[in-house]
């Protein structure tokens, strides 16, 4: 078994499970995505790696592998599913997630935008309309008010050139 991780491998480790942490139908915009598909049944992914529930175990495994940080994204549509309506349960989830990272001794690296949008924001034209940036700023302000004290590293946009 290969357990000798190079420094490059440790530095480049990403959390693919975190990108697929939600169960089928769990995201507020899921019905819109599935209904637009040529074959909606082809979009069912089940629980994927079930990272949403097993994150503490995943963090322990990452620490055992020698990782020192954990990059993940915050799902805007969970935090603000309706325009101006903040989801207290979603915020509580991310606070618990960050606490589990701290307990595991992993430095959180938070990505604010990783390609998904709340349905209401997309309906307004998303980022294609310059005036809509104010909604993203409002989301970021709220998020940092809630978790900013526990986070040192923030990535604004995942892969901004994509």
Per-region residue spans from a language model:
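Glycan-binding loop/region signatures in secreted carbohydrate-active enzymes
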Residues: 1-46, 50-51
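Substrate-binding cleft and catalytic face of glycoside hydrolase catalytic domains
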Residues: 22-33, 41, 55-162
């Amino acid at each position: 078994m290969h357990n000798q991780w190079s420094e490059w491998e440790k530095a480049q480790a990403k959390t693919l499970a975190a990108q697929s942490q939600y169960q089928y139908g769990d995201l507020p915009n899921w019905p819109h995505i599935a209904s637009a598909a040529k074959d909606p049944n082809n979009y069912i992914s089940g629980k994927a790696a079930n990272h949403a529930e097993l994150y503490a175990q995943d963090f322990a495994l990452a620490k055992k592998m020698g990782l020192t940080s954990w990059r993940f994204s915050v799902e805007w549509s969970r935090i603000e599913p309706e325009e101006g309506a903040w989801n207290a349960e979603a915020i509580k989830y991310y606070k618990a997630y960050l606490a589990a990272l701290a307990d595991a001794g992993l430095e959180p690296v938070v990505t604010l935008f990783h390609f998904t949008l709340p349905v209401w924001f997309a309906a307004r034209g998303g980022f294609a309309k310059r005036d809509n940036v104010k909604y993203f700023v409002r989301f970021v302000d709220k998020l940092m008010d809630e978790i900013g004290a526990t986070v040192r590293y923030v990535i604004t946009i995942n892969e901004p050139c994509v």
